[in-house]
Amino acid sequence: MNNLFPFLALDKIALQLGPLAIHWYAIFIVGGAALAVWLACKEAPKRNIKVDDIIDFVLFAFPLGIVGARLYYVIFQWSYYSQHPSQIIAIWDGGGAIYGSLIAGAIVLFVFSYYRMIHPLDLLDITIPGVFLAQAMGRWGNFVNQEAYGKIVSNLDWLPPFIRNQMFIEGHYRMPTFLFESIGTLSGFILVMVFRHRIKGLKRGDIFSSYLVWYGAVRFIVEGMRTDSLMLGPARVSQWLSVLLVILGIILFVYRRIKKN
């Protein structure tokens, strides 16, 4: 219990409406997605993309992104879920992987772009600022669920009490790696929003490539601090994927500059 700020004492459930429990995790995920859609709808006309196309894309991408995030997590935690199959669908308790959501979202985006005859890089550039913001918000869902934390530390006196108390896990204070990633992705969002219309010579796909490099670097660093990483043998899966993102981002950025129009 937080004695200084009792109203900030955290529970996974934000609101109980009879048998319906509304979890903080869901609020942060849905809230981040809603802001991402709003941002994309504001930008779409500048790329000659219909707002209806953005809405239709989200109606496919959001639920499948949640499925992808959960499926990715379950696959790499199969030793547990094979023994507790009823927990596979318990997404309200947390246990989703951003990379799974990104993979599912990317598949939906390319298929959707093909059928709607929209250049995929245009759709990516439009949606990336919102993705940054949604990821920054989503990490606070992990915070409430006491996920995405780091190694044991002696104290967290530099943090506000409500964060410090929530980072007291299994009898020890834990490094708030969720916070580091949230700040990193929020910084990426701010940079993109400030500079995307101010830098001359930006090419189609540059915002997307900047996301790949920025988020890949942020996630690689933060993942190295975590103690609850998804593993494949001795390897941290997310760090390998982060390296891949950075490489792909650099390749795309260079390719767009050497490609003849």
Curated annotation (Swiss-Prot):
Q: Where are the transmembrane segments?
A: 20-40, 54-74, 88-108, 175-195, 235-255
Q: Which UniProt keywords apply?
A: Cell membrane, Membrane, Transferase, Transmembrane, Transmembrane helix
How does this protein lie in the membrane?
Multi-pass membrane protein
GO MF annotation terms = phosphatidylglycerol-prolipoprotein diacylglyceryl transferase activity
- Compartments it resides in: Cell membrane
Xref: Pfam families? LGT
The main place the protein resides is membrane
Write down the superkingdom of origin.
Bacteria
Q: Name one GO cellular component term.
A: plasma membrane
User: Could you say which residues bind a 1,2-diacyl-sn-glycero-3-phospho-(1'-sn-glycerol) here?
Assistant: 139
Give an example GO biological process. lipoprotein biosynthetic process
Task: Return the EC number.
Answer: 2.5.1.145
Q: Does the keyword Transmembrane helix apply?
A: yes
Pathway of action: Protein modification; lipoprotein biosynthesis (diacylglyceryl transfer)
Record's function text: Catalyzes the transfer of the diacylglyceryl group from phosphatidylglycerol to the sulfhydryl group of the N-terminal cysteine of a prolipoprotein, the first step in the formation of mature lipoproteins.
The entry's family comment says:
Belongs to the Lgt family.
**What is the protein name for this chain?**
Phosphatidylglycerol--prolipoprotein diacylglyceryl transferase
Source organism phylogeny: Bacteria, Bacillati, Bacillota, Bacilli, Lactobacillales
